């Protein structure tokens, strides 16, 4: 049976977001999804697994409130930050009428969710230094409801200037909402907009436990916003969005002791990142290394070395960013364990220009 006549045209023509797992590369060293290389251990207690969980578990919310420094009524828990990206569009954007803005090169799920929900989008590229083009944004605010800014930006790893974000918040006041995706902010907490949350009611912050907390498989994220916005999001979120095991582990992860463990992980990532950057500078295949405040590095390689293909053939999986505007021949390298970083370096140093 041909189902095509039943399918919405936008879904029929949709190109799904190519997540690291969906690409289905085979390998032994996974440095393509910005995951922590070692799984943390938490004890599971599932006595009430026969019961539906609370829609918004209070203990988990209170723990994250203590960690983030905001009031509990400013927090929504979701299945990763990805779910909040979608929920915000459902609440604020009318299909085939309203617009969102995002600024490539950046995270791909803003575009994908807009296409799924039939919401128009304007892609306003960043400047050459990957900072916001505020004048272009200001001139294209007609019918815009949401502006998604990833900070630190994925995949470039840079921080958006605080004064630019403050200026943007003032530009769009009473016009649109700024959604600041802070998935990687735990690696550079000084750059967070959290201190602006009470000052600017049009600011929304997205967070996750997938990166610094090493819980990507858990799928647990948070939206920080004005309580009125949080209440709107609870209207459209599914009745039981967070599974009981996720609530249990996430609540444990946000206790003071386990937050200390997370801080230790972050220090290890910083050390490995510095070591990897220093070693990459000695590799003849490397054309440019971009500064990073995150758990990954964006690197531009000379094309004749065929780095992505060569490393993939040896079981080392990186993330090719060449499809993004301005990132031709660029690969994103997750900061793995010390041994994984050493393996990447030793493999790159063996590559010879004359080999290809």
Swiss-Prot record:
Its EC number is 2.6.1.9. InterPro entries: Aminotrans_II_pyridoxalP_BS, Aminotransferase_I/II_large, HisP_aminotrans, PyrdxlP-dep_Trfase, PyrdxlP-dep_Trfase_major, PyrdxlP-dep_Trfase_small. One of its GO terms (biological process) is L-histidine biosynthetic process. SUPFAM superfamilies: PLP-dependent transferases. Its cofactor is pyridoxal 5'-phosphate. Pathway: Amino-acid biosynthesis; L-histidine biosynthesis; L-histidine from 5-phospho-alpha-D-ribose 1-diphosphate: step 7/9. Gene3D superfamilies: Aspartate Aminotransferase, domain 1 (3.90.1150.10), Type I PLP-dependent aspartate aminotransferase-like (Major domain) (3.40.640.10). It comes from the Bacteria. GO terms for molecular function: histidinol-phosphate transaminase activity; pyridoxal phosphate binding. It is an enzyme of class 2 (transferase). Signal peptide: none annotated. The modification N6-(pyridoxal phosphate)lysine is found at residue 211. Keywords: Amino-acid biosynthesis, Aminotransferase, Histidine biosynthesis, Pyridoxal phosphate, Transferase. Pfam families: Aminotran_1_2 (PF00155). The keyword Transferase applies. CDD domains: AAT_like (cd00609). It catalyses: L-histidinol phosphate + 2-oxoglutarate = 3-(imidazol-4-yl)-2-oxopropyl phosphate + L-glutamate. HAMAP family: HisC_aminotrans_2. NCBIfam families: hisC. Belongs to the class-II pyridoxal-phosphate-dependent aminotransferase family. Histidinol-phosphate aminotransferase subfamily. Homodimer. This is Histidinol-phosphate aminotransferase. It comes from Blochmanniella floridana. The gene is hisC.
């Amino acid at each position: 049976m041909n189902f095509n006549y039943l399918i919405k045209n936008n879904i029929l023509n949709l190109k799904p977001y190519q997540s690291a797992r969906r690409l289905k590369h085979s390998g032994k060293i996974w440095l393509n999804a910005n995951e922590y290389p070692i799984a943390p251990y938490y004890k599971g207690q599932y006595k009430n697994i026969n019961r539906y969980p609370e829609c918004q578990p209070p203990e988990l919310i209170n723990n994250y409130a203590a960690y983030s420094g905001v009031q509990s009524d400013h927090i929504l828990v979701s299945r990763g930050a990805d779910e909040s990206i979608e929920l915000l569009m459902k609440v604020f954007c009318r299909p085939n009428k309203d617009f969102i803005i995002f600024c490539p090169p950046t995270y791909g799920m803003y575009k994908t969710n807009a296409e799924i929900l039939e919401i128009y989008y304007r892609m306003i590229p960043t400047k050459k230094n990957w900072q916001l083009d505020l004048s272009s944004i200001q001139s294209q605010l007609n019918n815009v409801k949401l502006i998604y800014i990833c900070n630190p930006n994925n995949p470039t790893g840079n921080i958006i200037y605080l004064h630019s974000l403050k200026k943007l918040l003032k530009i769009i006041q009473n016009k649109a909402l700024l959604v600041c995706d802070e998935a990687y902010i735990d690696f550079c907490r000084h750059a967070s907009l959290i201190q602006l949350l009470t000052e600017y009611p049009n600011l929304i912050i997205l967070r996750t436990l997938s990166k610094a907390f090493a819980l990507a498989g858990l799928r647990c994220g948070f939206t920080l916003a004005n309580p009125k916005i949080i209440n709107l999001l609870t209207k459209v979120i599914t009745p039981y969005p967070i599974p009981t095991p996720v609530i249990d582990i996430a609540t444990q992860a946000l206790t003071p002791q386990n937050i200390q463990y997370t801080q230790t992980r972050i220090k290890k990532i910083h050390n490995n990142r510095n070591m990897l950057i220093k070693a990459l500078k000695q590799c003849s295949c490397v054309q440019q290394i971009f500064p990073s405040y995150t758990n990954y590095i964006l690197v531009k390689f000379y094309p004749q070395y065929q780095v992505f293909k060569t490393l993939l053939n040896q079981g080392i999986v990186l993330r090719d960013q060449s499809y993004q505007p301005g990132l031709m021949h660029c690969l994103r390298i997750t900061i793995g364990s010390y041994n994984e970083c050493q393996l990447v370096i030793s493999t790159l140093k063996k590559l010879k220009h004359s080999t290809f």
